[in-house]
Amino acid sequence: MAYPEKVGARVRYNFGRLREVLDLPNLIEVQRNSYKWFLEEGLREVFQDISPIQDFTGNLVLEFLDYTLGEPKYTVEECKERDVTYAAPLRVKVRLINKETGEVKEQDVFMGDFPLMTEKGTFIINGAERVIVSQLVRSPGVYFDETIDPSGKKLYTATIIPNRGAWLEFETDVNDHIFVRIDRTRKIPATVLVRALGYGTKAQVAELFNEDKNILETLARDNTDSEEEALVEIYKRLRPGEPPTVDSARSLLTSLFFDPKRYDLANVGRYKIQKKLKHGVLYRYGPNPDGKTVFDPYLKKEVPQKREFIRELTKEDIIETIRYLLKLMNGEGQVDDIDHLGNRRLRSVGELLQNQFRIGLSRMERVVRERMTIQDVDVITPQVLINIRPVVAAIKEFFGSSQLSQFMDQTNPLAELTHKRRLSALGPGGLSRERAGFEVRDVHHSHYGRMCPIETPEGPNIGLIGSLSTYARINEFGFIETPYRKVDKENRRVTDEIVYLTADEEEGYVIAQANAPLDEEGRFIEPRVNARSPEIVVVPADRVDYMDVSPKQVFSIATALIPFLEHDDANRALMGANMQRQAVPLLKAQAPLVGTGIEYKAARDSGVVVIAKESGTVEKVTSTHIEIRNDRGYLDRYKLLKFTRSNQGTCVNQKPIVKKGERVEAGQVIADGPSTDYGELALGRNVLVAFMPWEGYNYEDAILVSEKTVKEDYFTSIHIEEYECDARDTKLGPEEITRDIPNVGEEILKDLDDRGIIRVGAEVRPGDILVGKVTPKGETELTAEERLLRAIFGEKAREVRDTSLRVPHGESGKVVDVKVFSRDNGDELPPGVNQLVRVYIAQKRKISEGDKMAGRHGNKGVIARILPEEDMPFLPDGTPIEIVLNPLGVPSRMNIGQVLEAHLGWAAKVLGYYVSTPVFNGASEESIFEALKEAAFKESGLRSFMEKAGLNEEELIGAVETAEKRAGSREALIKEVEGAESSGETIMAAIERTGLTAGMVNRLEEAGMTKKEILGAMKKLLFARSGKMTLYDGRTGEPFDSPITVGYVYMLKLAHLVDDKIHARSTGPYSLVTQQPLGGKAQFGGQRFGEMEVWALEAYGAAYTLQEILTVKSDDVVGRVKTYEAIVKGENVPEPGVPESFKVLIKELQSLGLDVKVLSEDDQEIEIREVEEDIGETAKELGIDLQEGELPEVEEADYSEDVEDEDMFNEEFFNEDFDLEDDE
């Protein structure tokens, strides 16, 4: 049965049957550790690689000695406010040595501002919070592969892949010859390369490979006879057309593979080659005078302490690779699986940054060399030589435009957390969506405990983007490790010793599942145990090497938040995991009644809650800050974020959860953030749900909700939009932010202050002015009168036009904040901008028809109707249902978890506690029924009366079971009892149908219960046994036909809100070429009337409607103006003209050289005019005076055909998780 457990500030009853051996690690340590490594080691490595830089004569030498990072100029909050990058200055100590004179100059050189990672594992770049996603790439090393020739023969290939440098590929052909390709050039016999390495004669080569017949075959194909000839042959292949010499050939080969500056295997490449070829060359040892040694886990022996990995290729590597290839040809050895996580590694922030920094430094190195030759040697200093532009540019480019530097998904805390733990196979040096096949995307057995098999986007990126498992960590080589408990084989007991293994280390071990039953001392209870090796096998207990630490180690955080995951189909679980990340933070967050026990950890590590740094006592609590006197006597002040905007426009607001005088421990949550409730993740609300159809309103996954959810703000959320307006210098003079706007009445200006900026607290609607701004107009020749006015009134009469910032269509709300930045106050602004105003508008959005909702099991739907509370179905005690879901959504989708959640939720609500049911280790059906029974007893108070009456539980349940058998099923019995009651039978007859005997009823009556109470209590007990009860129609009060499943389910409101999607247009921008309205909400476009819609009108014979749609409502430019005028004047709409698309068609045909004319009925040629002529003519006819340079409104076309510039860089366009079903 469940046991209570303290989770943060709340107690949850845990239904888990296994104890947790290992706590979850810090969930964002992937990011933090990687960046820490970069600052401490990564930067130093790059400087060592590039240092020293020598000029072409070898006279001047520039060395990089040491580096320091200064303090950042602004805090994180200030950076967000001012749109600057959170960065610290990097200073490098540089030494310049002049070898001729022996002169040494040292200087500290500033190398640009380096972006810093925040506590939360993110970067602030130009004021926006960004995340660097870790990339899954193929590890450097040697790979063997086999293909089958059309003739049925196995052909083998071996590839040596470096971290950077030339590839070396070996392959065999049908005749068992071995060939090599150097850096993707044409193939040559492999023996040519062996000879070039210094094994010149045939005998030496044959001896090297034990006279293997395949090598002898290859030698027969080899036309070279000595080392020199082989070198020349290779040179000819690599540099065709250049005169080959032995020396140049030797230096080319050396620089390709054996020069650390040009070829780098990285530590991981050396480790992988060593692991595969096992030839013992791993380190280059430094001098070891003190004789200190360390134990090496890879070589399994003591080695000198001062050592470094050999990062370039060696002759042995090449020889051993060919030897292994020969082994494969002789049927020994194994080929590699490139989708195995032992062959794919993670490049996290640190390494990605290091590579980028290296690119910048190598560009700088070229500049330094050039400057060394040009500048005067005597006056030269390090500062003069070093140009930091390329370094700064490389870093800026990486953070600004790399595919792996992403705008952080901040919809809710889970979205933030998951984004930081995301693994992507895309990006530079990775795969591309188009080329990635099935195998790469598929779940692989090596993903177990490392990468979640469930959480991945639907759509083109499926399987290419994954999520790190809960307990996984990254080792020094970038491989993902997962923890196991070691099994003491001698005593056959599972110890608490934790061992982290990578995917290739794990191969060959037998690993038991976490839920294998153990006794008190940790020994296996069963003689045979389920295990992996790597297939699922049943083995004797004494063969087990390791055991999983927890059932949730397989899954990611989002997946492990789904209760009863074990009862859901994987496809639906995937949707559930992804949709939790789209849940909008609600005004009144509520932790789930049925959780999985990791809600607290997820919220804590996401960084949205405030955590006490030290233990102490709370001295002061306000809505904006908390003060704690710590145990050392100092005062710690914690500032809270109030109603700020997240990247996705949701509201970030923190509120204290501690009281004055309360004792606080270090690490305790002291303030809740968005979507958290007492430090636990709270993405939605617990609502009372019934699974039943209702008048067709929940057809096809639609959802019926009660008006109560609207009234009581169950699903109300706050959304904040940011609008900005800048005043720039133009050619005609500076723009001005002012309240003095031409042709605008006082009514419209009522909410602007004297600067022309809207006041905080104003309610605004579409079209309202937020910031008044005027821009100088082109000066025209002035008349004498105007010159006189100008002379009298000065500049004021100058021509300006209104370019104020207005609230866009379809947006409205309250102004919650205004920020003004100006040159005069010393704020950093882009060039040409004098003043910048930002206005923040907040909206309270209640739930409404068209909003998308979902549970945690992939059960999503759109609200079809909001029904008055009194019309909703109600329970026997009169409580109205809050949400009605369609039962048909369950069987075919196979996500039964939602039904179990509803039952357990009901029990938890009645018993008044929260429960946690961890994944694959949660509540069983028995324990759910047990909890429901307890709830029934508690609600009806039956137990105390039974004790008084001397009735025991077994007796009562036995009687009910008998009645159920008689009725045929539990549901049938409920129906029978309800029927008896409503058909006017006596209460006693109804009670007897539940199985109670007259004697039992008498005893209960003596104990103080009335017959009505006894019947009510028995109905509750029947509900507890089936999870179903009779509901009544709120409109008629009649009972529904069958008993219905009712319970509490956790529902989320997703970010696909109807307010963001609904859109209407009367007139608006037109496309430049076709003159048809643009499409889409972003462009304020029209609705597409497509081919099929046209067919429909044709089929109806609606000729005039059709003509209008194809002409005046679309691209008949003149007709549009005339029709508009006719409507305004109340006249009849004139005949349509020629649509622009027809003119375009004619122009296209003419451009093909076809002479196309348009003829009238009497064969007269009709002249097709251009738009400008047309408008001019029309204007004349209508008597409109068009001054020069002014066209009517209609022509103000929006030049972006489809997508506005802002949208080009709008994250939503590039967000990999777009939901295909919703964004059609």
Curated annotation (Swiss-Prot):
CDD domains of this UniProt entry?
M23_peptidase, RNA_pol_B_RPB2
One Gene Ontology cellular component: DNA-directed RNA polymerase complex
What domain of life is recorded for the organism?
Bacteria
Q: Which reaction does it catalyse?
A: RNA(n) + a ribonucleoside 5'-triphosphate = RNA(n+1) + diphosphate
Q: Which SUPFAM superfamilies match?
A: beta and beta-prime subunits of DNA dependent RNA-polymerase (SSF64484)
Q: What Gene Ontology biological process does one annotation of this record name?
A: DNA-templated transcription
Q: Which GO terms describe its molecular function?
A: DNA binding; DNA-directed RNA polymerase activity; ribonucleoside binding
Pfam families, from UniProt?
A: RNA_pol_Rpb2_1 (PF04563), RNA_pol_Rpb2_2 (PF04561), RNA_pol_Rpb2_3 (PF04565), RNA_pol_Rpb2_45 (PF10385), RNA_pol_Rpb2_6 (PF00562), RNA_pol_Rpb2_7 (PF04560)
EC number of the protein: 2.7.7.6
Q: Kindly give the Gene3D superfamilies that the UniProt entry links to this protein.
A: 2.40.50.100, 2.40.50.150, 3.90.1100.10, DNA-directed RNA polymerase, beta subunit, external 1 domain (2.30.150.10), DNA-directed RNA polymerase, subunit 2, domain 6 (2.40.270.10), RNA polymerase alpha subunit dimerisation domain (3.90.1800.10), RNA polymerase Rpb2, domain 2 (3.90.1110.10)
* Keywords, alphabetical: DNA-directed RNA polymerase, Nucleotidyltransferase, Transcription, Transferase
* Top-level EC class: transferase
Supply the InterPro entries for this chain: DNA-dir_RNA_pol_bsu_ext_1_sf, DNA-dir_RNA_pol_bsu_external_1, DNA-dir_RNA_pol_su2, DNA-dir_RNAP_su2_dom, DNA-dir_RNAP_su2_hyb_sf, RNA_pol_bsu_bac, RNA_pol_bsu_CS, RNA_pol_bsu_protrusion
Q: Which PANTHER family match?
A: DNA-DIRECTED RNA POLYMERASE I SUBUNIT 2
The entry describes its oligomerization and partners as: The RNAP catalytic core consists of 2 alpha, 1 beta, 1 beta' and 1 omega subunit. When a sigma factor is associated with the core the holoenzyme is formed, which can initiate transcription.
Q: Spell out the family assignment given in the record's similarity comment.
A: Belongs to the RNA polymerase beta chain family.
Q: What function does this protein fulfil?
A: DNA-dependent RNA polymerase catalyzes the transcription of DNA into RNA using the four ribonucleoside triphosphates as substrates.
> What is this protein called in UniProt?
DNA-directed RNA polymerase subunit beta
The gene name reads: rpoB
